[in-house]
Amino acid sequence: MGLRSHHLSLGLLLLFLLPAECLGAEGRLALKLFRDLFANYTSALRPVADTDQTLNVTLEVTLSQIIDMDERNQVLTLYLWIRQEWTDAYLRWDPNAYGGLDAIRIPSSLVWRPDIVLYNKADAQPPGSASTNVVLRHDGAVRWDAPAITRSSCRVDVAAFPFDAQHCGLTFGSWTHGGHQLDVRPRGAAASLADFVENVEWRVLGMPARRRVLTYGCCSEPYPDVTFTLLLRRRAAAYVCNLLLPCVLISLLAPLAFHLPADSGEKVSLGVTVLLALTVFQLLLAESMPPAESVPLIGKYYMATMTMVTFSTALTILIMNLHYCGPSVRPVPAWARALLLGHLARGLCVRERGEPCGQSRPPELSPSPQSPEGGAGPPAGPCHEPRCLCRQEALLHHVATIANTFRSHRAAQRCHEDWKRLARVMDRFFLAIFFSMALVMSLLVLVQAL
C-alpha cells in the first residue's frame, strides 16, 4: 500500500513539472528568436529588400463610438480601432528552427511602422502612435492594432436642420512617403460597424472607403490616401418635440386673433404675445446652430411664421379701426358694399342678427319726403282761429325737426353698423387666409420628417 502511494505521488510531481519545463523551453526559444531577429535590425529604414520596391500597407478601420459632433466649430470626435498590416522583409524565420514558433508579440516601437496620419486632423496635438504591441508572423507579416481618438474637421451643412444628413470624411495617408515607396489600400469596401455603440443624436448609415491618388504641387510623385466617409443622419425627435412642435402650435394659434370679438380688447394682445413667444424660441434655436451661410429649414419656418404673425397683427389693428370708426365717417363705398358686404359676406356666412346665412340684407327703403307743413298723422281738425293756426304750425315744425333728427341718427347708426359688419367680414376672410397659410407651412415642414 505504501509503495503504490509513493509511485502515485511521483507521477503527480512529474505531471506538474513537465509543462513548466516545456513552457520554459518555449520562452527560451522566443528569446532566442527575438535576439536573432533584432541583432542587426533597425526601425529607421523602410523594410524592403529592394529600395525601388513599393511597400504595401493595408488599412482597416473599425468605428467604436461617436464621442462628439461640434456643429459650431465643425469638429467631429470619434473613437476608432485602426489596424495596419504590411510585410517586413527583415523579420522572417523558419518555424521549425524555433520549435514550431510561428508568431510573436513585441512592442510596436521596436519595428518599423508606416507614418500614416489623419490628414484632416482638427486639433493642435502632433500626430502620434499608440504604444501597443504588434503581431509578427514567421513570413514577415506585421499586424498592428491600435485604438485612436480622432478629432477631424467636418463641414456641417445645416440647411435641412433638424432633418439633415452629414458626410464627414477621414483621410489617412503617409506623411513623407510617396506612392512609389509606400502604397496604402483599404481592407474591404467600408469600415466595420460591428462594435459600434449607438449614439443618441446621430444615426450611422455607413462608412464607405475610397482610395485616391493625388499629386501635389510640391512633388512630382503621386501620394495615395484612403478616405473613410462617415454617413450620418440626425435623430430629429428631440428637436421636433422641443422646437418645431411648439412653433407649429403657436403658428396655428396666431390666426385665431381674427376670431376674437373686437370688444374683448385682446385681439392685438394675442398677436404681440405670440410674436414674443416666437422670438424666445428663435433665440434658443440660434444658440444651438453654427454660424453658416445657409439658413436652416426650421429657421426659415420661424422667420415665415414671425412674418405672418406680424402682418396679421397689423391687419388686426386696421380692422379694429374700421370697427370703432366714429359717427362722422363716410358711408361704405358702393363697390365695397357690393363686393364685401354682398358676395363675400354670403360666402363667409357673415350676417346680421336674425338674417339667415346666404341671404343678403334687403335694401332699405328710404322714407318718403315729408314737408315741414305736411307731417305724418291724421289730418288736423278744423281750426279757423288765428291763435289755433299758429299753434298748429309750431307743433308741425317741432314734429318735423324731431323726425329729421331721428332719421339722421338712424342713418348714422346704420352707417356705423355697416362698417362694423365690414370689419367682421374682413376678420372672417383673413382668419381663413392666415390659418390656411399656417397649416400649409406646418405640413411642409413636418413632411420633411417622414
UniProtKB/Swiss-Prot annotation:
Chain ranges on the Cytoplasmic side, renumbered to this chain: 323-428
Listed Pfam families: Neur_chan_LBD, Neur_chan_memb
Coiled-coil zones: none
Leader sequence residues: 1-24
SUPFAM superfamilies: Neurotransmitter-gated ion-channel transmembrane pore (SSF90112), Nicotinic receptor ligand binding domain-like (SSF63712)
Paired cysteines (S-S): C154-C168, C218-C219
Catalytic activity: Ca(2+)(in) = Ca(2+)(out); K(+)(in) = K(+)(out); Na(+)(in) = Na(+)(out); Mg(2+)(in) = Mg(2+)(out)
Expressed in which tissues: Expressed in inner-ear tissue, tonsil, immortalized B-cells, cultured T-cells and peripheral blood lymphocytes.
Glycan-carrying positions: N40, N56
Cellular location(s): Synaptic cell membrane; Cell membrane
Membrane topology of the entry: Multi-pass membrane protein
Cross-referenced InterPro entries: Neur_chan_lig-bd, Neur_chan_lig-bd_sf, Neur_channel, Neuro-gated_channel_TM_sf, Neuro_actylchol_rec, Neurotrans-gated_channel_TM, Neurotransmitter_ion_chnl_CS, Nicotinic_acetylcholine_rcpt
Single GO MF descriptor: transmitter-gated monoatomic ion channel activity involved in regulation of postsynaptic membrane potential
UniProt-annotated stretches for the region Disordered: 355-380
Ranges in the topological domain labelled Extracellular: 25-237
Regulation: Activated by a myriad of ligands such as acetylcholine. AChR activity is inhibited by the antagonists alpha-conotoxins RgIA and GeXXA, small disulfide-constrained peptides from cone snails.
Record has Signal as a keyword: yes
Assembly and oligomerization: Forms homo- or heterooligomeric channels in conjunction with CHRNA10. The native outer hair cell receptor may be composed of CHRNA9:CHRNA10 heterooligomers. Found in the stoichiometric form (CHRNA9)2:(CHRNA10)3.
PANTHER family: NEUROTRANSMITTER GATED ION CHANNEL
General function of this protein: Component of neuronal acetylcholine receptors (nAChRs) that function as pentameric, ligand-gated cation channels with high calcium permeability. nAChRs are excitatory neurotrasnmitter receptors formed by a collection of nAChR subunits. Each nAchR subunit confers differential attributes to channel properties, including activation, deactivation and desensitization kinetics, pH sensitivity, cation permeability, and binding to allosteric modulators. Forms heteropentamers with CHRNA9.
Family: Belongs to the ligand-gated ion channel (TC 1.A.9) family. Acetylcholine receptor (TC 1.A.9.1) subfamily. Alpha-10/CHRNA10 sub-subfamily.
Record protein name field: Neuronal acetylcholine receptor subunit alpha-10
Lineage start: Eukaryota, Metazoa, Chordata, Craniata, Vertebrata
Gene: CHRNA10
